Amino acid sequence: MPVLNLKSDLADADDLETLMAGIGRRARAAGRAMALAPAQTKDLGLRAIAEQIRTSAPAILRENARDVSAAQAAGLTNAIIDRLTLDEGRVAAIAEAVEKVAGLADPVGRQLAAFERPNGLLIERISVPLGVVGVIFESRPNVTADAGALCLKAGNAAILRAGSDSHRTATAIAAAMSEGLARAGLPADAIQLVPTRDRAAVGLMLTGLGGCVDVIVPRGGRSLVERVQAEAKVPVFAHLDGICHVYVAEGADLGMARSLLLNSKMRRTGICGAAETLLVDAAVAETHLKPLVEALLESGCAVRGDAATQAADPRVSAATDADWRTEYLDAIISAKVVDGLDAAIAHIEANGSHHTDAIITDDTNAAARFLNEVDSAIVTHNASTQFADGGEFGFGAEIGIATGRMHARGPVGVEQLTTFKYRVHGSGQTRP
């Protein structure tokens, strides 16, 4: 089976629409083959991909060095360059992550429900692949393998569009993946990386490529996600912001609250599951507010608060209205005192992003109300918001976090990259 040449004349094609249409058609054909591939064959393909990534490490690192050099010359931030940079250890980790996906249970062909109708019809609901998943990402080249492997495990084909910063590295990784698929007897076109930096290619992907793309997953900053959500003609699995709250309610143990707050905010400040707002119930503010604020400040976190929070510590600066709706992705948190559970829920509804919100309390009735009434993809009771992660949920890995209401919500793992069909078994029944 031929391996897709990602450095072919496609990259020089004058007609971008023709280029993208061809990618879409090949992905649709490959997706049909992947949908019928046995679980064992898919797993062999993923293990072959992991081995090929290891074999191709020198080539991947050479291309990565070119990307990093260009990023440095362009004056990109150290944070972006760190996300972009690979070394031997990171390449090995990419290969290992693909192998872990191979070890997950097959999400395809599972019987989700079965029932018999009074007329004798036997009806079952069975999980099936989505088809073709378009993944648009920015500077993290590991997304090429992570997202591609999850799509393949779920019996899908993937069209990957890397950001210009990571294009060379992503191309090398995608080439290794296509070679691994071909060695396992699977279609190399099940993984295709768009071979152009032209941003118009993103717009074409968002149209669905004439019905060839079934869902789009953006992995990147706010501007990318906003564009995808505004322009996409196909379903999108994404979240715009991660404005996550920690609500320290009446009945909260102070030691637990301190530990969970610091972990939710400071374990990693730059991820979407990091807490951005602290809400302290007025019933426990006298005993809990000051030590919690001090713990944040002493850990290196700046605090922007309401009048009550400012009164608790002179180092607290005044919060603006915008602070309650800001995803800092940094060692900054907004904090305020709320008058009870209803006020906390109302604040989250007005200012949150429906991502992940936590309540800390030993009051099981209050916790039950919070978990039921807060309209977020993930709600936690006495647990850190940073558990908002597919790996922590036991999904093995995730392609992203979705906060929409249709199909996938929360961590999007292999199970969420499937849909279902109904199989109806009869014995000659006709409808009266």
Curated annotation (Swiss-Prot):
The keyword Transit peptide does not apply. It is found in: Cytoplasm. One of its GO terms (biological process) is L-proline biosynthetic process. It catalyses: L-glutamate 5-semialdehyde + phosphate + NADP(+) = L-glutamyl 5-phosphate + NADPH + H(+). The keyword Iron-sulfur does not apply. It is an enzyme of class 1 (oxidoreductase). One of its GO terms (molecular function) is glutamate-5-semialdehyde dehydrogenase activity. Pathway: Amino-acid biosynthesis; L-proline biosynthesis; L-glutamate 5-semialdehyde from L-glutamate: step 2/2. InterPro entries: Ald_DH/histidinol_DH, Ald_DH_C, Ald_DH_N, Aldehyde_DH_dom, G-glutamylP_reductase_CS, Glu-5-SA_DH, GPR_dom. GO terms for cellular component: cytoplasm. SUPFAM superfamilies: ALDH-like (SSF53720). Keywords: Amino-acid biosynthesis, Cytoplasm, NADP, Oxidoreductase, Proline biosynthesis. Its EC number is 1.2.1.41. Belongs to the gamma-glutamyl phosphate reductase family. HAMAP family: ProA. Catalyzes the NADPH-dependent reduction of L-glutamate 5-phosphate into L-glutamate 5-semialdehyde and phosphate. The product spontaneously undergoes cyclization to form 1-pyrroline-5-carboxylate. This is Gamma-glutamyl phosphate reductase. It comes from Methylorubrum extorquens (strain CM4 / NCIMB 13688).
